């Protein structure tokens, strides 16, 4: 999929009805001529709109309509004529969505990277990538870190459909990998959900739990989230108040308002630790799946070496 998406309406509803009626009641050629009448006056605006969203003409553009017919072919021709490298999706977006959903049903060699909140798992994933390991960064694609503070500092979340599209492409790119590292997540990441079939596969994969001391993780959380203003931190805590509990919520918010961010985060970390252990043990065959690796720091490079050494044993 493209790094960004742009909707270019070829026809408005009235124009679409006119062209469609001509195609059904007269013939294809008549419909094409009518379509060209509507399309012709929009060509320049379409090109200019694409220019606003692309860095240069060397950027590849994927053009699609719902079924991959003349509409996408016409726009692809126009952009190709202007100098862009263009391709279309055979069968249109409808076929692409069917392909997307099929990717979640396939088998993959997943390895789950686990650890309590604040264990620097995302940084460890990126460090594994630097060592030519295959990874899928679910939080990166979801634009959300998963916790109460997960949306802080992140761009807006994608729609569920766009999340699935990008996830399917990433799965396809790594389908032949010896192993694919994925961070242990809840099925819901902010406002998007990991597709059910894929979620089921992830829950059956080996889980490598990086066990890091509480104080190390607390320091990591403070460094990454303590920089945000009090209002944002309070709003984030309010989102989990039903699960966190009324007394704990009130205490944590008071700590933040008093400037004692460390104590507030300590309460939250204890909450997430309990929640994580409970969720982890809902897996079937957890005793067979779980591999615990002890570490004394959140250093991604050091923990990568520990992890890779462990799986070679």
Model-based region annotation:
Residues 130-200:
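Conserved nucleotide-sensing/catalytic segment adjacent to the nucleotide-binding pocket
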Residues 39-89:
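Catalytic cysteine-centered active loop of the rhodanese-like fold, especially the PTP/DSP P-loop
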Residues 16-18, 25-59, 97-102:
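Helix-loop module immediately N-terminal to the HCX5R catalytic loop
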Residues 82-97, 137-142:
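A short glycine-rich beta-strand->turn/loop micro-motif centered on a GG-aromatic cluster
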Residues 70-71, 111-130:
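Glycine-rich phosphate-binding P-loop
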């Amino acid at each position: 999929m493209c790094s960004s998406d742009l909707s270019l309406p070829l026809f408005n509803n009235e124009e679409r009805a006119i062209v469609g009626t001509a195609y059904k009641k007269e013939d294809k050629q008549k419909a094409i001529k009518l379509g060209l009448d509507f399309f012709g006056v929009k060509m320049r605006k379409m090109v200019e709109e694409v220019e606003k969203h692309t860095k240069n003409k060397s950027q590849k553009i994927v053009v699609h309509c719902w079924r991959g017919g003349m509409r996408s072919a016409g726009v692809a021709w126009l952009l190709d004529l202007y100098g862009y490298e263009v391709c279309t999706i055979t069968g249109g977006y409808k076929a692409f969505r069917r392909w997307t959903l099929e990717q979640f049903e396939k088998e993959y060699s997943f390895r789950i990277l686990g650890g309590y909140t604040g264990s620097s798992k995302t940084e460890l994933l990126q460090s594994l990538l630097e060592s030519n390991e295959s990874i899928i960064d679910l939080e990166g694609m979801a634009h959300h870190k998963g916790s109460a503070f997960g949306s802080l500092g992140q761009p807006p979340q994608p729609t569920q459909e766009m999340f699935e599209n990008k996830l399917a492409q990433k799965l396809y790119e790594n389908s032949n990998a010896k192993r694919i590292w994925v961070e242990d997540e809840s099925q819901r990441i902010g406002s998007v959900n990991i597709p059910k079939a894929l979620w089921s596969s992830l829950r059956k994969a080996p889980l490598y739990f990086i066990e890091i001391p509480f104080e190390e993780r607390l320091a990591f959380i403070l460094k990454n989230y303590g920089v945000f203003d009090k209002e944002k931190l309070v709003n984030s805590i309010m989102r989990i108040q039903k699960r966190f509990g009324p007394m704990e919520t009130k205490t944590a918010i008071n700590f933040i308002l008093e400037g004692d961010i460390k104590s507030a985060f300590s309460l939250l970390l204890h909450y997430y630790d309990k929640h994580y252990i409970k969720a982890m043990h809902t897996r079937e065959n957890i005793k067979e799946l779980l591999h615990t690796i002890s570490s004394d720091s959140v250093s991604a490079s050091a923990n990568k070496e520990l992890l890779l050494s462990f799986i070679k044993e």
